[in-house]
């Protein structure tokens, strides 16, 4: 793993990326393990029913950023990252990640859950406006909305992957009687295949920006 990575700086809030995968089988795996999920960012800010389960990272219950666990850099944290026992229980998810998702060095890979009636309080996760965070919608009820701080909203269609600009304030409200399951993938690299896929999506969706080399952040 390199200590730096190409990041795409953009004012766009998100773009859609199309992957060739069966999201329904992955959704079944995410849902089947619900009893194993851990509360995410407990006490950090207002949220209800926000939980996570780690497939790759510092441990099944280590759902937060590596800084929360005493590491000084992503490079040091990466040395201790591994596929967890949860990954062993998710063959369809692993097939997608290892054979279809263009990444050689994974950071955190997590199932994320917002329970029925739950919400994620408004927050932002990056000081720089980056299109980098991959959020794959697996189960997203109709009355569950991603809300931007400026008032815009986004319905994240099941089976669709989104590259999110989490520099901007955002929140999630699940006003339904069904749980919301997503798969979030953090890449520690920017492979040629990723850039090809990403650049094609930007061109199709008229999204502009520029690549910059930064120290790996996640």
Q: Where on the chain are the PLM-derived regions?
A:
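Non-heme Fe(II)/2-oxoglutarate
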Residues: 1-100
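A short glycine-rich, His/Asp/Glu-containing loop-to-beta-strand
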Residues: 97-116
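Tight coil/turn sites that cap or link beta-strands
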Residues: 116-118, 159, 167
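Short beta-strand His + acidic residue motifs that chelate non-heme Fe in jelly-roll/DSBH
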Residues: 120-123, 145-146, 164-177, 184
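A short hydrophobic beta-strand segment most commonly corresponding to one strand
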Residues: 132-137, 161-163, 177-195
């Amino acid at each position: 793993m390199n200590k730096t990575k190409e990041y795409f700086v953009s004012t766009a809030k998100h773009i859609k990326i199309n992957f060739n995968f069966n999201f329904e089988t992955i959704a079944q795996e995410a849902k089947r393990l619900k009893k194993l999920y851990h509360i995410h960012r407990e006490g950090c800010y207002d949220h209800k029913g926000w939980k996570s389960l780690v497939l790759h990272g510092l441990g099944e219950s280590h759902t937060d950023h590596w800084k929360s666990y005493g590491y000084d850099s992503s490079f040091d944290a990466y040395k201790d990252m591994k596929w967890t026992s949860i990954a062993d229980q998710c063959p369809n998810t692993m097939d997608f990640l290892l054979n279809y998702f263009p990444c050689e060095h994974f950071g955190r890979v997590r199932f994320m859950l917002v329970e029925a009636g739950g919400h994620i309080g408004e927050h932002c996760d990056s000081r720089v406006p980056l299109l980098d965070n991959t959020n794959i919608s697996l189960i997203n009820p109709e009355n569950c909305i991603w809300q931007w701080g400026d008032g815009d909203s986004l319905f994240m269609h099941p089976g669709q992957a989104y590259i999110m600009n989490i520099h901007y304030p955002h929140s999630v409200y699940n006003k339904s009687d069904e749980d919301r399951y997503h798969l979030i993938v953090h890449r520690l690299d920017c492979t040629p295949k990723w850039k090809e896929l990403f650049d094609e999506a930007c061109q199709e969706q008229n999204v502009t920006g520029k690549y910059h080399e930064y120290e790996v952040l996640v």
